[in-house]
Amino acid sequence: MYLFFITSELKKWLRDPLLSFMLAYPIVFALLGRYGVPWLAKVSGINMALFADLVLVVLTLMTPHIFGALIGFSILEDRDDHVLTSIQVTPLSVAGYLSFRFVLVTVLACVSTWFILWFSQMGGLTLSQMGAVALLSSFAAPLTGLIINATASNKIEGFVAMKGIIGILIIFPIISLFFMDAKEFIFAIAPGFWPAKVISSIVRGEGVLLLSQGQYYW
């Protein structure tokens, strides 16, 4: 049954031009990290090693939100087609149906994020560190999907909501990287704050990531 759901979901994504295009984003991000950033550094003469954590944060945080948008649009389509209403008369509950789909995108986001970190070869992260960062950041995928469905009633509204949601959820962690005092915790409300802090701590060689304001500054 679960294999059928996975196949059905992937077919739905591939049928839609927008969703199928979004599926290619992780590959694009991986190629940008591996070849685009070094090329830009060579052309501009900028030492990108100084900004490795910033680049990795952008690539890492974007991926789960893309998968969250995928499942968000897919559920919006189901709502338009009254699929969720039809499921209520089947042995499968709506909660079980949605839970499975959110687990699916979380796993895909985790694997894709790990692949981007591994393929880009930036920051000197170990495989276990890549796995930890990928797992931590992947939980943003279902959150994005839920927020899109809470703020939009159709795919057009969903597209507008997606741009605003992803922009806000990504810009806060990025801004936090420019603060070296307790002010950075202002941006801790964003889900991507801690994945960004983990990446920054590893890339900058700060060692153990402290988890409270007191440990950091007192």
PLM feature spans:
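Hydrophobic alpha-helical transmembrane segments of multi-pass membrane transport proteins
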Residues: 51-89, 94-116
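Membrane-interface helix termini and inter-helical loops of multi-pass transporters
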Residues: 38-50, 120-125, 185-187, 201-205
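Alpha-helical transmembrane segments of multi-pass membrane transporters/translocases
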Residues: 24-26, 197-218
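N-terminal Sec/SRP start-transfer signal
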Residues: 1-19
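A structural motif at transmembrane helix-loop-helix junctions in multipass membrane proteins
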Residues: 17-20, 135-172
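Alpha-helical transmembrane segments and their short interhelical loops
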Residues: 94, 104-153, 213
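Hydrophobic alpha-helical transmembrane segments
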Residues: 20-23, 55-59, 99, 103, ...
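Hydrophobic alpha-helical transmembrane segments of multi-pass membrane transport/permease proteins
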Residues: 13-39, 55-70, 110, 162-176, ...
